[in-house]
Design a protein with these regions (language model features):
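Phosphate-end processing signature that detects enzymes handling 5′-triphosphorylated RNA
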Residues: 118
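Aromatic/basic-lined ligand-recognition segments
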Residues: 122
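Glyoxalase I/VOC metalloenzyme domain signal
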Residues: 1-110, 125-198
Length: 198
């Protein structure tokens, strides 16, 4: 069982653009990556909603104002894509307060802090090879929230080419040797998403 589940509002149909193939189940539509499961619940969330659940963490646990969702059972044999969730972005007005909450709830310590101008970023990894929780402190943020996610895929070039003007022109990522492309809002994914090379 993948240790992180992301619950997404709106329709799963446009997510083929990101290299995912959501499959129907009693719980809703599911798409499995190598390190996480994405869920479009049968009791549909509003478009733009993003929730997170962790294996072993009780539903309702307080992640500095973010309420953790219930971790659900997924069917055996769920086909997994060769993509992975590189990181999930949490926005906050106080980096260390939020990072302390992440550590307390998940048991995953703060690995490092990066400062870029007035923006500070803290990084936690959920399990070996797992999802990175990137906590971003910005002056214009008033409360902690889940913002969006980045999907790393070996099919990056093919997906970007197929998506055409639904994604931005690829550019160099912060990590040396990697490239990133942002999925535009008109693609209909409902939440901020970027694609990245592995």
């Amino acid at each position: 069982m993948k240790p992180v589940q992301l619950f997404i509002g709106g329709s799963p149909s446009p997510w083929g653009l990101a290299g995912l193939s959501p499959q129907g189940s009693p719980a809703g539509f599911l798409a499995s990556t190598s390190n996480a499961t994405l869920v479009w619940p049968s009791e549909e969330l509003p478009s733009g909603a993003l929730e997170i659940a962790f294996d072993g963490v009780q539903a309702g646990a307080d992640l500095d104002g973010i309420e953790c969702a219930e971790f659900i059972s997924t069917p055996d044999g769920l086909e997994s894509s060769d993509s992975l969730i590189d990181h999930v972005v949490l926005m906050t007005d106080n980096l260390y307060r939020t990072c302390e909450a992440v550590t307390e709830v998940t048991g995953c310590p703060l690995k490092r802090v990066r400062e870029v101008g007035e923006i500070r970023q803290g990084f936690h990894r959920v399990g070996e090879g797992g999802v990175i929780l990137e906590v971003v402190e910005r002056a214009d943020v008033s409360r902690t929230s889940l913002w969006g996610l980045v999907i790393a895929t070996p099919s990056f070039d093919d997906l970007v080419q197929a998506a055409g003007d639904l994604v931005s022109e690829p550019k160099d990522a912060v990590q040396p040797g990697r490239r990133i492309s942002t999925v535009k809002a008109k693609a209909g994914l409902g939440i901020p998403v970027a694609l990245m090379t592995p």
